[in-house]
């Protein structure tokens, strides 16, 4: 009755593991949220015959079947030798329809990691990898020792259940697969550990986000924390969210942001108004000039300061206004500069804005978008026709420092540059030419040359070559990371593609989306 997803662990390749996780993810997903991230099905709509997924894993000496709850993608137990072993926080009646003829055995621990600590090592002390997963399956197949069972389940949870929920974890596993029969190990790092722990909180806050921003979620270890407070930070690493609620998608949502259908008629998420920085071109912040709040004062781009500087903190109100110290962001006419003014005395339509999920801020009355006409500090903002240019991209956030990361692509090779060219090469930890800085304006810049941006050579049309060139705030250098692993040019919808799936050509091109592995990227 229940869907079955098989995986032969000892024969794993990057392709077979990716296919396995994709099939599992597709079985779990109930649609795409308005934020562009897939989520699990609405529990209220799940029929009894749809409540579980059976994951059939083959190890070196035997096979077991993991039982997954489709409501939360958690493991409930496993079947081995016609005995169904289940966690002690899972009632036998709740899984009565799963293998009804099998014997039942309740394990002495629950499904959460805190409950397993008395039986298995701490997570950051447990090696993960394909060989370790195969041995984990064998432990579940033959062992009656609770410590061995707990260790096996921890590894299965990390490399199967959690990898289905997080592209970041899937990427860690992929990178551990060197080739057929050639596997490395890894241990959970701070990001893996914390996103798993904070998954429910992330799901709630993302689905309750307003204009892409949400209340910050602390990640990392307590001794070295970092924060996510914007959908753009999560969309590349989070594959599935718990179903919490939704808000109806606005007519202004970009079709390039959401590839699949968007759920509708779901409970509406409560979301509050957001006060944060608005970060844009070249990583600078929207700023009321010289911290003076008189009517008509100009709004400019300026290096981001601290949260103590009121002239860079903006409140995005539910009435469509964007306010700094109570004054509204506005323009006298589309041809003139952006400024602040008393919200109650200015022409109301000129004070109304829509903040699109793709980072565009549009004034509906004029049909034009907020633009930083140059990259210089102190440049006054204005309105221009929407070109989906990097000069027209914004992020509402309290994290003003750009993200620095590697970008891993086809064959688990790293994106690299050393001048104007862009290609894939073997990943080398710490290599500056493989470290990329992701700016709020949608540009992708090599850490070794921050004045250059990845861009299409000419327009981003099919087969256009991707090059590393001087940043100009143009549409051909504005990119969007989607939830499926694509790096999308917002203007044309083309994605970065390893030409002919052949890294030896040393060429990345723009191409229509087809979803094959040469268009899949991991951060």
From Swiss-Prot:
The alphabetical list of record keywords is: Allergen, Disulfide bond, Glycoprotein, Glycosidase, Hydrolase, Lectin, Plant defense, Protein synthesis inhibitor, Toxin
Q: Which residues bind AMP?
A: 111-113
Indicate the enzyme's highest-level EC class. hydrolase
A Pfam family found in this protein is Ricin_B_lectin
PTM text: N-glycosylated. Contains mannose and galactose.
The signal peptide annotation in the UniProt record is none
E.C. number(s) listed in UniProt: 3.2.2.22
List the CDD domains hit by this protein, alphabetically. beta-trefoil_Ricin_RIPs_II_rpt1 (cd23443), beta-trefoil_Ricin_RIPs_II_rpt2 (cd23444)
Q: Which residues form the propeptide?
A: 251-265
Q: Which residues are glycosylated?
A: 358, 398
Q: In which tissues is it expressed?
A: Expressed in roots (at protein level). Expressed in seeds (at protein level).
Q: Which biological process, per GO, is one annotated for this protein?
A: negative regulation of translation
The cysteines joined by S-S bonds are 245-269, 285-304, 328-343, 414-427, 453-471
Stated family: In the N-terminal section; belongs to the ribosome-inactivating protein family. Type 2 RIP subfamily.
Q: Protein name, please?
A: Volkensin
């Amino acid at each position: 009755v229940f869907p079955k997803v098989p995986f032969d662990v000892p024969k794993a390749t990057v392709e077979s593991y990716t296919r396995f996780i994709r099939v599992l993810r597709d079985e779990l997903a109930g649609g795409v949220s308005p934020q562009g991230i897939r989520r699990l099905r609405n529990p209220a709509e799940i029929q009894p015959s749809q409540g579980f997924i059976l994951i059939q894993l083959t190890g070196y000496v035997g096979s077991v079947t993991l039982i997954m709850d489709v409501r939360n993608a958690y493991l409930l137990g496993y079947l081995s030798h016609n005995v169904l072993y289940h966690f002690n926080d899972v009632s036998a009646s709740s899984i009565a329809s799963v293998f009804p003829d099998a014997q039942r055995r309740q394990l002495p621990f629950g499904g959460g990691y805190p409950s397993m600590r008395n039986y298995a090592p701490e997570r950051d002390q447990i090696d993960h990898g394909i060989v370790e997963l195969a041995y984990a399956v064998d432990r579940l197949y033959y062992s009656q020792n609770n410590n061995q069972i707990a260790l096996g389940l921890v590894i299965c949870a990390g490399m199967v259940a959690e990898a289905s929920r997080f592209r970041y974890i899937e990427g860690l596993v992929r990178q551990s697969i060197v080739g057929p029969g050639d596997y490395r190990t890894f241990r959970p790092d701070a990001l893996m550990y914390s996103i798993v722990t904070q998954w429910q909180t992330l799901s709630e806050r993302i689905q309750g986000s307003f204009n892409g921003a949400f209340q910050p979620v602390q990640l990392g270890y307590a001794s070295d924390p970092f924060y996510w407070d914007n959908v753009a930070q999560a969309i590349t690493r989070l594959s599935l969210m718990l179903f919490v609620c939704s808000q109806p998608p606005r007519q202004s949502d970009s079709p390039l942001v959401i590839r699949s259908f968007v759920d509708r008629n779901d409970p509406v998420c409560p979301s509050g108004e957001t006060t944060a920085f608005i970060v844009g071109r070249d990583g600078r912040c929207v700023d009321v000039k010289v911290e003076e709040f008189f009517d008509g004062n100009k709004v400019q781009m300026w290096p981001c300061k601290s949260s103590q500087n009121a002239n860079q903190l903006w409140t995005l109100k539910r009435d469509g206004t964007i306010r700094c110290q109570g004054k509204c962001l506005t323009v006298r006419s589309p041809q003139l500069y952006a400024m602040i003014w008393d919200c109650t005395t200015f022409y109301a339509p000129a004070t109304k804005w829509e903040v699109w999920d793709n980072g565009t801020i549009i004034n509906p009355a004029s049909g034009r978008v907020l633009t930083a006409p140059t990259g210089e500090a102190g440049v006054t903002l204005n309105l221009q026709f929407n070109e989906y240019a990097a000069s027209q991209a914004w992020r509402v956030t309290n994290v003003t420092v750009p993200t620095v990361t590697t970008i891993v692509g086809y064959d688990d090779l790293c994106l690299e540059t050393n001048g104007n060219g862009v290609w894939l090469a073997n990943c080398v930890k710490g290599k500056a030419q493989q470290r990329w800085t992701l700016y709020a304006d949608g540009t992708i810049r090599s850490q070794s040359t921050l004045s250059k941006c990845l861009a299409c050579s000419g327009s981003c049309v099919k087969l256009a070559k991707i090059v590393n060139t001087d940043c100009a705030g143009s549409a051909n250098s504005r990119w969007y990371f989607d939830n499926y692993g694509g790096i999308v040019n917002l203007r044309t919808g083309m994605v970065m593609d390893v030409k002919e799936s052949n890294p030896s050509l040393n060429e990345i091109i723009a191409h229509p989306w087809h979803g094959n592995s040469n268009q899949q990227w991991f951060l």
